[in-house]
Amino acid sequence: MHLNKYSEVVERLENEEFEQVELGAEVYQQLLAIYLYQNKLADAKLLWMRVPANLRDDKELIQLNLLNIALQNNNYADFFKHIKYEWSERVKSPVEDLLNKQREELFKLMGSAYMSIYQHNLLELSLMSEDELKHACAALNWTEELDGDRVILKPKVQEAPPARGNDDQLLKLTEFVTFLEN
C-alpha cells in the first residue's frame, strides 16, 4: 500500500471543491476516505468542518467522521466498530486499504507491546473473525498456546537492534564537548 496511490484522485477532488460552489456528498465522501487512508487526520477534520450543513446528515459522511474521531483518539475498538459498514463503491477501495493498514498497525503494536495476548481479547479489539485472525497471526509467525480452554497468542520475538556501546557514546559526547569548548 503506497500513500501516493490516491494522490491524483485527491488533487482532482480538491480542485473540484475549490472550483465549484455546490458539491454533492460523493466528493466529500471520497476526499474524507482518502484523507483517512493517508493519515491526514487534520485535513479530514477540516474537511468535515467545511462540509455544508445540509450534507452533514449523509450517513456515509457521518460514518467516515466517526472513523476520523476514533483515529484521532487512537481508539482501535471504536475504529473497528465503525468501519463495519456497508460502504458505497466510491469509497470502498480507500476504506478497505485503511482497514488493512490499521490492522497491520494494530498487530505491529501488539507484537511489540505484549509477550502474549489472549485470542478473545484480540478478536474483541480487532473485530476480526476467528479465521481472519488465525490467517493474520500465521502470516506474522505468531504462535498459539492453550491455557485451559483459552488460546494465547504469542508474537514472534523481535530482536532488538544492537545497542551502541557505552564507550562509543562516551567518545561521541567527549568529542562534542571538546568541539563546544574550542
Swiss-Prot record:
Disulfide bonds: none annotated. GO terms for biological process: compound eye morphogenesis; COP9 signalosome assembly; defense response to bacterium; imaginal disc-derived wing morphogenesis; oogenesis; photoreceptor cell development; protein deneddylation; protein stabilization. Pfam families: CSN8_PSD8_EIF3K (PF10075). PROSITE patterns: PCI (PS50250). Keywords: Cytoplasm, Developmental protein, Differentiation, Nucleus, Oogenesis, Signalosome. One of its GO terms (cellular component) is cytoplasm. It comes from the Eukaryota. It is found in: Cytoplasm; Nucleus. Residues 1-167 form the PCI domain. Essential component of the CSN complex, probably composed of CSN1b, alien/CSN2, CSN3, CSN4, CSN5, CSN6, CSN7 and CSN8. The PCI domain is necessary and sufficient for interactions with other CSN subunits of the complex. Belongs to the CSN8 family. Probable component of the COP9 signalosome complex (CSN), a complex involved in various cellular and developmental processes. The CSN complex is an essential regulator of the ubiquitin (Ubl) conjugation pathway by mediating the deneddylation of the cullin subunits of the SCF-type E3 ligase complexes, leading to decrease the Ubl ligase activity of SCF. The CSN complex plays an essential role in oogenesis and embryogenesis and is required for proper photoreceptor R cell differentiation and promote lamina glial cell migration or axon targeting. This is COP9 signalosome complex subunit 8. It comes from Drosophila melanogaster. The lineage of its organism: Eukaryota, Metazoa, Ecdysozoa, Arthropoda, Hexapoda.
